[in-house]
Amino acid sequence: MVSAYSAKSIECHGYNIVRILDGRKKDVNVVINKESHIIVIPHIVKDNFKIYSKIYPVEIKNKTAIFYKAVHKNKDSEYYSDYSNSFTYKIGETKEEECADNKSGSCSRGIHIAHKSWAISFGSSWDNMALLECEVDIKDIVVCKDTDGKVRASKIKVIREIPKEEYYDFK
């Protein structure tokens, strides 16, 4: 264990567990980016899409963003939600769901979507996982203060199922 008061950087090697507290002894949100640098995210700016899109890998096209959803796929090639198997998805279809506009709970009501690696991780223990690429109007996205990469939306358009060969093909 290392105490690094007022440190501007910490270099770690191997397997590390990192807990960061601010001056008030409160946990600080942390993201380790692809270069393995630790980035501290202030609570006050984390809950808007502009900041989210700078922290997490998300593709933006004009006023839409590309997100991913881990779903179950049955033997008839039908896609359904982990939360409710009656909530189904079809390629090319637009799905709508009431979405809570509160930013204090990432698991509140809405269609839960995420950047690709988060979605893959979420469904990785399922034998019947499929990964759907979805297009979402940015205005329909709710980014919560406690996000770890997942967001909620009121409406998504299912573009395609991502082949397993593309799971770790990050652009």
Regions found by a protein language model. Give the residues of each.
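Short, glycine-biased loop/turn motifs at secondary-structure junctions and
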Residues: 1-171
